[in-house]
Design a protein with these regions (language model features):
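A generic structural signal for short coil/turn motifs at secondary-structure boundaries
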Residues: 78-82, 118-120
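A short, polar/proline- and glycine-enriched secondary-structure boundary/capping micro-motif
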Residues: 80-84, 129-131
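Alpha-helix N-cap and loop-to-helix initiation/capping positions
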Residues: 84-85, 124
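N-terminal signal-anchor transmembrane alpha helix of single-pass membrane proteins
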Residues: 1-30
Length: 168
């Protein structure tokens, strides 16, 4: 009987270690995995009717404090500091998490291939997201949405190139 209990304990320990390694290897903070965007799962789109915002984070993790943290995973090496576009995307997920779960995430994680950044989610970042959303809405309404050609390679490789009247 003791051998069965010992075998059960060892098996549980091994499974726990495997799960923990996968969690860390995926670049996720310690905690309960609430959602992970993988092809086999239905997408978990978060919606804010209040702000007219939708988004699908790469992962959501409930950390030991009970807060839900959005994780944005990138397929590139980390810059010295997170790119502004990556920051605002992760901050937008924080706005969505805040509305969906009723708690403000203390930080957001941006995971690059070689390292991650845990960036604080502040009222200033929330205001940045909301201001940017408003600017986008105004630009769409006015029809003044010129494409950025600051990086010509992005234009050449864009999936909408064939439909774009501003392609290089």
């Amino acid at each position: 009987m003791i051998w069965i209990a010992a075998a059960f304990f060892v098996t549980a320990l091994i499974l726990l270690l495997i799960h923990g390694r996968r969690h860390l290897r995926a670049g996720l903070p310690a905690g309960e995995l609430v959602y992970l965007d993988v092809a086999s799962e239905q997408p978990s789109v978060l919606v804010s009717r209040r702000y007219g915002l939708k988004g699908k984070p790469d992962a959501l993790v409930r950390i030991p404090s009970g807060d839900v943290i959005p994780v944005e995973r990138k397929k590139t090496r980390a810059p010295k500091r997170p790119y502004a576009g990556d920051l605002i995307q992760a901050a937008a997920y924080c706005v969505l998490v805040e509305e969906q779960y009723g708690r403000t995430p203390p930080f957001m994680r941006i995971q690059y291939t070689d390292r991650h950044f845990d960036e604080p989610y502040t009222i200033e970042r929330k205001q940045w997201v909301l201001r940017t959303c408003q600017e986008i809405r105004q630009a769409r309404q006015s029809g003044a949405c010129d494409r950025s050609h600051a990086i010509p390679a992005k234009c050449r490789n864009c999936g909408q190139r064939a439909n774009c009247d501003q392609a290089l």
